[in-house]
Amino acid sequence: VQRPLRKPRPMSDPHAQHTAERVRDAMFARDRAVRGLGMEIEAIAPGRADVVMTVREDMLNGHDICHGGFISALADSAFAYACNSYNEVTVASGFGIDFVAPAREGDRLVARCVEVSKTGRTGVYDTEVLNQRGERVAVFRGRSYTLKGKPVAPA
């Protein structure tokens, strides 16, 4: 049974969307891993991010399907952009991923991450990875930890 992903907590800050966009731009400019894998940030909002990647030939494993490490990197990247969207440096404290269908060369994957819970300095985020047909490829749950006193995108 598929459980729908929860929506992020409501934001009282009227500039929250602008902040999320500034963080996206600042992170992407420094994010060599995301750029090197050809990922793009398709959408950003407070506590949410959609990141896309097309499976290339050099991402295939010995079974001619996308290596799980690349799918994990995609899901982890969406998680990173979602949990940093509040402009507080936030890192992963752990994650789990389940692969439920293969991705193949040429597939356009989208990782959609949403905040499930954010309390104090810890958070929980769910990400699903879908192919271009909307078929679920993987489900990912990340746990985050927010560091003190350092913005991602200084004003």
Stretch-by-stretch model annotation:
Residues 2-155:
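Terminal targeting signals and extreme-terminal segments of soluble enzymes
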